[in-house]
Amino acid sequence: YSGPLMARNPVLLPLPQKYVRTNASFHPKEIAVSSEGKLRSILMEFLEELPVSVQPDSRYKIEVSLVDKLDGIPLNSEEAYQLSVSSRGITIRAVSEQGAYWAIQTLRQLTERQGKRYSIQGCEITDWPAFRIRGFMQDVGRSYISMEELKREIEVLSRYKMNVFHWHLTENQAWRLESKIFPMLNDSCNMSRMPGKYYTIEEAKELVRFCKEHNVLLIPEVDMPGHSAAFIRAFRHDMQSKEGMAILKLLMDEVCEVFEEVPYLHIGTDEVKFTNPKFVPEM
């Protein structure tokens, strides 16, 4: 296996901070797993992609453990991990489930597959993110994107250790998040592109859960006071007016309830002429 399958260096993206390739490779037909809880489930999902059976008494082992500290990590230590691959086994050490999850994504990239064969490149890796926030913004306000496609995007982002999915939900063209208190926002007549397309409250909560499963933080954005033509069509009030701000405060209460499991709500404030100096401080 080590010859034809490992003739070239694996492509690792992003490149780990410290990566030493060895001459070993890991390719047993059976393996024992040492891990618990959520991490075991993630690990089993990866192993199901390979032609390998899980046998508790196998002499080949893959072990994932959470530790209090990893040495030699200068920043963002909560997402750091150490990964060791030899001919006898694989060891992952991290201080958090998120760090261990990133290690498993690296393990995926180290794996070469050819028919019913596979081989994992031997190495010693110590890795941590250079940036605390590694984000991707998806604008669904202008163009609705199906839940299935959004989930595919999030899954791909997590494979490359992107940890923030910024969800731009409102635009001049449409207000894409369901509102129970102001249903006119979702009326087709108030959307200038892809009318009638929006995300239900349950779908929004579902996407938050999906992001969490993939160690990605979802940050919802309700853009204000610019990019708000859809709001104006629905209410006939500018967001910066007294009436508009009163409506927005009620809407923000509703939006915060929808996204109660996430720590941030983005309010935009870009590309607009401010006519009300109290708008941003109040909102």
Predicted regions and their residues:
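Active-site loop/helix belt of alpha/beta enzymes
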Residues: 268-283
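Feature activates predominantly on carbohydrate-active enzymes
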Residues: 78-266, 273
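Acidic, contiguous N-terminal accessory segments
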Residues: 1-129
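Residue-level preference for nonpolar/small residues embedded in alpha-helices
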Residues: 39-42, 149, 203, 279
